[in-house]
């Protein structure tokens, strides 16, 4: 790939440089043309850079700041007072063109507030959305948005989310005309609140979006659609519930496989297959939520992500930057709005 620079909020998340720096080094090993700017406390960052190979260090820049957005900071407070924080400086690097994307595991509300103010939304986009991919029984990813950036949404906003989600799926998975559905309490046309009903009418009249209708909660993981759209209140609860169920299933499976000698013996025989299944159910495998609809790329990692999970978020940022996701969304939205207005 051509040279690409990412900005990492090295201090964000529960583990800070203990996770972000080793993950950055692993990303550099995987992407030979990648450069990374680590933003945070240089003294803490350097601890994890001491043993790094020189060729990797030559592709790392450290910008020092000892100010951090805490997980307890309210978004407005962080926006007004944390002007030299590692999170804000990382976003500013994207705004100023020094980085193609930024990744942070920090305070979600603060990240969204700073990103919206500093990067601005794309033309035709009222609000950015938080989107992530989920597993499915067909083993293809399913994109769900919004995941909490917007608690309530009108029909126009849901329509914009559908467009952005469709373009994201095309860009990341290179899928032609991905199937888009609205999450609803039923599949019948009469079901749903006014916002969902009106959004459905707009999408039905938009030829450039492959809208398939409503989808219920029990079909989210079926793999029958590629993009599922809802407001942030519903999306966040759906995501957190899914993660909780996944953890429960993993726990129950591990517990069941340790009860009794014969069961333990069989478990050892099929250990690789069991590990593969557990990996697919692990939420860390899908770490990285994109804040789309902005004039720059911002990827949010889980706050408690380990090194491997954080690496997933970095890889997602690389992919979106390579595909020039904001430009793709802008062009597609302009084309669709032109068709609608004509």
Curated annotation (Swiss-Prot):
Could you name the Gene Ontology cellular component terms for this entry? Answer: cytoplasm
Q: Where in the cell is it found?
A: Cytoplasm
Q: Which domain of life is it from?
A: Bacteria
Q: Name one GO molecular function term.
A: phosphate:acyl-[acyl carrier protein] acyltransferase activity
InterPro entries recorded = FA_synthesis (IPR003664), Phospholipid_synth_PlsX-like (IPR012281)
Offer one Pfam family short name for this entry.
FA_synthesis
Where is the chain membrane-spanning?
none
**Which pathway does this chain act in?**
Lipid metabolism; phospholipid metabolism
Q: Does the keyword Cytoplasm apply?
A: yes
Into which EC class is this enzyme placed?
transferase
What keywords are annotated for this sequence in UniProt?
Answer: Cytoplasm, Lipid biosynthesis, Lipid metabolism, Phospholipid biosynthesis, Phospholipid metabolism, Transferase
GO BP, sorted A to Z: fatty acid biosynthetic process; phospholipid biosynthetic process
SUPFAM superfamilies in UniProt:
Isocitrate/Isopropylmalate dehydrogenase-like
EC numbers for this chain: 2.3.1.274
NCBIfam families membership = plsX (TIGR00182)
Name the job this protein performs: Catalyzes the reversible formation of acyl-phosphate (acyl-PO(4)) from acyl-[acyl-carrier-protein] (acyl-ACP). This enzyme utilizes acyl-ACP as fatty acyl donor, but not acyl-CoA.
What family does the database annotate? Belongs to the PlsX family.
| HAMAP family membership | PlsX (MF_00019)
- What is the designated name of this protein? Phosphate acyltransferase
Q: What is the lineage of its organism?
A: Bacteria, Pseudomonadati, Pseudomonadota, Gammaproteobacteria, Alteromonadales
């Amino acid at each position: 790939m051509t040279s690409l620079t990412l900005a990492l909020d090295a201090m964000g998340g529960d583990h800070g440089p203990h996770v972000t720096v080793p993950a950055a080094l692993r990303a550099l090993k995987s992407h030979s043309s990648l450069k990374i700017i680590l933003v945070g406390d240089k003294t803490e960052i350097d601890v994890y850079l001491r043993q790094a190979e020189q060729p990797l260090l030559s592709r790392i820049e450290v910008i020092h700041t000892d100010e951090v957005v805490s997980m307890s900071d309210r978004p407005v407070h962080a926006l007004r007072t944390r002007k030299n924080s590692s999170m804000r400086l990382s976003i500013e690097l994207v705004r100023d063109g020094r980085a193609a994307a930024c990744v942070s595991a920090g305070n979600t509300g603060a990240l969204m507030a700073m990103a919206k103010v500093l990067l601005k939304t794309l033309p035709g986009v009222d609000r950015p959305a938080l989107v992530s991919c989920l597993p499915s029984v067909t083993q293809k990813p399913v994109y769900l948005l919004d995941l909490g950036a917007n608690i309530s949404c009108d029909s126009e906003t849901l329509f914009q989310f559908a467009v952005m989600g469709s373009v994201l799926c095309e860009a990341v998975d290179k899928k032609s005309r991905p199937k888009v559905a609205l999450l609803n309490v039923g599949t019948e046309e009469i079901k749903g609140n006014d916002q969902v009903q009106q959004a459905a009418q707009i999408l039905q009249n938009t030829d450039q979006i492959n809208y398939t209708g409503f989808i219920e909660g029990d079909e989210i993981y079926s793999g029958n659609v590629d993009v599922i759209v809802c407001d942030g209140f519903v999306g966040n609860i759906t995501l957190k519930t899914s993660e909780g169920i996944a953890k429960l299933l993993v726990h129950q499976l591990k517990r069941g496989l340790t009860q009794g000698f014969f069961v333990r013996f069989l478990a050892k025989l099929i250990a690789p297959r069991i590990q593969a299944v557990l990996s697919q159910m692990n939420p860390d495998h899908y770490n990285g939520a994109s804040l789309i609809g902005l004039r720059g790329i911002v990827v949010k990692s889980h706050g408690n992500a380990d090194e491997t999970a954080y690496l997933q978020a970095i890889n997602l940022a690389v992919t979106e930057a390579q595909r020039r996701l904001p430009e793709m969304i802008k062009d597609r939205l302009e084309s669709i709005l032109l068709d609608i207005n004509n």
